[in-house]
Amino acid sequence: MINPVEDLRYAFRGLRKSPMFTIVALLSLGLGIGANTAIFSLMDQALLRSLPVKHPEQLVLFSANGPRRGQVNTSYGDIYTFSYPMYRDFRDGNRVFSGLLARFPISFSMSWHDQTERVYGDLVSGNYFDVLGVHAAIGRTFTPEEDRRPGANPLVILSYGYWKRRFGGDPGVLNQTITLNAHPMTIVGIAQPGFNGVGVGEAPEVFVPMMMRSQMSPDMNDLEDQRSMWLNIFGRLKPGVSREQGEAAMNTFWKPILEAEAKDLNFSQRIRERFEKRHLSLLPGGKGISSASAQISSAIVVLMGMVGLLLLIACANVANLLIARASARQREISIRLAMGASRFRLIRQLLVESLVLALGGGLLGLLVAEWTGEALLKFLPSDPSMMGISSQPDGRVLLFALVLSVMTGVMFGIVPALQATKTDLASTLKDQASGVVGGGLGHLRLRKSLVVTQVALSLMLLIGAGLFARSLYNLKNIDAGFHTDHLISFAVQPSLNGYSQERMRSLFERLRENIGRLPGIRTASMSEVGLLSGDNESTSIEIEGYQAKEDEDMNVFQDKIGPGFFATLGIPLLAGRDFTNADGPKAPLTIIVNERFARHFFGDQNPIGRRIHFRREKDSLEIVGVVRDGKIVELREKPLRCVYLPYAQSQVQYMTFYARTTQEPSVMTQTLREEVRRQDPNLPIFNVKTMEDQIDESLFMDRLVAALSASFGALATLLAAVGLYGVMAYMVVRRTREIGIRMALGADRRQVLRLVMKEVVAVAVVGIGIAVLASLAMGRLIQSQLLDVSARDPWVMAAATLTLAVVALLAGFLPALRATRVDPLTALRYE
């Protein structure tokens, strides 16, 4: 009869009697399970978790491939952005959705009781909460009627977390007024707990009606602009309508809309045909939209593979320990079998012991996962795209840890249990009586196989660590196209405080001039788009005298900059001139392009003096200069086609300032903050960082993968060394009499050392060979994560192999040295 309580007592009693075994096994499992749990938690939050909304499987995300016209907000990639008129047409004319919503992430300057802070939030359509099926914890949500007239409903809904954090969870804030971007807004509700919008990893603090767009973003009157692509659109399919059916219906509906837009925008026949070829796709939307998913998804999958290998190594290590433990208990097991105990009964007891170990390792693993999660958060950038990532395990993560622990217990416990109970009773009792260590050659072969597995997996992790470290080194030393040393930056967004365009230009110019005169500052300038920040503002253009090719992409990156920008950044001017203070609002419109732009559109011709049109501007802009290519959005990018405009001739909402210092740039932080406060004490300053810090932040995923792979590789190597040491020590004990006989017959210590080390080398060589072949075969899986280094790089493989070989030889040397000290008389005592 099965008695689980008795099995548990037996397991705990046995583990208490072997404290060293228990501690080593728990540590091995805790590290392996903890690492897997931590990476799974990150993967779950970034890639797997469904939105906490009603029936998330019914949600779809709108995307459209093909040429676009006008300005595109590409925080999430330009295929996911649409104009408000497009959204309105989709919402009012479709027959396959029960509702369509639109949203746009935005930052706000929030004032409450004379305290001002910068908060993140979403502009949302009036039906946003209804379509998602999200309710208010207190108060109410927006209504579709509040989505009709621009500026008519100055309302705001707070997220539950922000309400708790900023207002102490006081229900009395309902119907109170806060100030957002210099506009009084009435709090009408608190969103339900756990709802953080539809942006993966984000944590919007406030939700504002879409019709408040112009009030929240002065000078952005794009609610009627067909060419301003800025909205994400989600739809909820009607019951019984599949995603494919919805997509087909929407493309049929969209075609006349595209034709009408092309006609309104006065496209040429060729461009109109290209524009009308665009295809609308409905993607699964139940997991939300992520601005960082493309960047982190592949890296997280690689990390998950690495921690999987680490767990296999830990399992092999514990299995080795269990086999050694079973060898020491062979006499006990044989006697119990001889007295009538069934083999199934003993296997069950041994498996219960393994499961107790695994669950204990799982509990320890939760602590390791939380510590690892806290360390992971330090790598993440401090921007809205990652604000919602948490290190705290939720129910899904706890369930994952439990299931993984049980599976691990069975995985490392079943083979040792079968091996331990498969024994020849007579020979085992005879060997034990004569002092021979139990287990036989079968145990030794199995343990060697496990160590070979550990060596192979450890080397694979070491090779991966070397490749990612080399790739990170290449990224950090890549030519960015500008000088990164002694450069500090910060950003301001006066539009959030109600500044007009004229007032903003005046502020920007005063800041640029005053900062440039500060002690310790050599030169200063500014740009609207922060370098290497991941932001990408693009627009479509037409060039006078240039005939675009069929399906040619005419979108280019654009930035609005101040005088001296290229000199401050150290970007060489290749032709023409730089902008000056004379390039003001009333001066002729000018533009500077980079060499990639000039080479693509003009070839060997001189671009200076050529003219460009973009957006709806009737006036053309004259190219007055050409600058060298550089990294703009991220370090991995190929050179973009870039155009630069004088900020004084453009509409701007915010500005990033750059200062080239004569001393360590970080010491200038307080000085820069004080200068901004002198201009406006209520103007928030953010993203104050050196360019080195900006680069590190932009490489957060590369740094994370490199650091974790190095840690996993080192840990795996340690576990492999422990396993190899244990096997060789066991082998030496089993062959004590053989070694004694050899020494009695004249073998010296060097020969004995060579005998044992030959076994070490054999195990290491087999494991290394398997690892090298596997790494060569699987290298293509991580090649996309590497920069300027092949996944089959011979130098990395050689360095990793040498490292593991040295560790293996050191691990085997200690048992070999012990073998040379065997006393032949003692070894032969039982012969």
Regions found by a protein language model. Give the residues of each.
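Short, strongly hydrophobic transmembrane alpha-helices
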Residues: 18-46, 50, 313-315, 358-362, ...
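Alpha-helical transmembrane segments
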Residues: 31-65, 372-381, 457-486, 729, ...
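Membrane-proximal extracellular/periplasmic loop immediately following the first transmembrane helix
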Residues: 51-107, 229-232, 264, 475, ...
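Mid-to-C-terminal secondary-structure elements
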Residues: 121-144, 153-298, 374-378, 464, ...
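Alpha-helical transmembrane segments of integral membrane proteins
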Residues: 1-22, 288-292, 321-348, 352, ...
